[in-house]
Amino acid sequence: MALIDDARSVLHLDGVTDEGTVTRLNMLIDHGQAYLTGLCGAKLDYESDREAHALLMAYVRYAYNDAVEMFLSNFHDDIFRKQLNVAIALREEEANADQ
């Protein structure tokens, strides 16, 4: 399922296909991806990484409801856990590359 379809489902907008809503959701998805990538310090796979996907959908939900300023404080623990997982994965990649 595409991210836009997931966002529609999370927001209970499954049947909504008007151009304005779709454009807004795509913009929120793009902003969320950029924001989370910046926080985690690496590009995330929002399609297959369940943690990254869940964080992105939460960001979209908060942004859609004009509450994005609450996202970081409400998801601090989840974001921190993702940052640690990304850092560990990057460290392992570096160690494997050095061998």
Q: Model segments located where?
A:
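Conserved short "hinge" loops at termini or chain/domain junctions
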Residues: 1-55, 85-99
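Short, hydrophobic/amphipathic alpha-helical patches that form generic packing surfaces
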Residues: 54-66
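C-terminal structural segments of small proteins and small subunits
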Residues: 64-84
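Short linear motifs centered on Gly/Pro in flexible linkers and helix caps
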Residues: 2, 26, 62, 73-74
